[in-house]
Amino acid sequence: MIIPERMSVYINSLDVGNGAFLDELEQEALRDDVPIIRQDMQSFLKVLLAMHQPKQILEVGTAVGFSALLMAANTEMCHITTIEKYEKRIPVAKENFQKSGMGHRITLLEGDALAIMQELTGTYDMIFMDAAKGQYIHFLPDALRLLRTGGILISDNVLQDGDIIESHYAVERRNRTIYRRMRE
């Protein structure tokens, strides 16, 4: 998130931690270069979860299950549906859900998020998008269709640490297409 440092310090000061299981999972993910949400987003999510107390959450982009487990640990009576395409990470996420003792509150859907979202029915109180940033624009119509009136849509790191506002030529060549799509 790009927020003033004093706000970030304040939000993080409210955070009481994630517990041993999530702390260990976070360290493993960082060690293995698995992208997971940063500390400031973790704290922000916890505040939103406490304020809104969602009962149904859709997560787009499971990775190893860290965010889904964080949301499950910080809600009561909430079910999380999460979507993951990367075959290498799916069994790891499933194992983490089982080990955590919260797996009964999480449904993992395997495959392309766009195709899966088009088939989903019902509504969600919160949708958390943390997948391929360049695909967010394609996810948006279904995300809005699936979001209940008054629900919360969170798209992680859409500003790419501020790089999205840089000149086309100031951005590394490999990131130009992603940033162009995100500007749309």
Where are these regions (language model features)?
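A short alpha-helical cap/connector motif
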Residues: 1-126, 133-154, 158-184
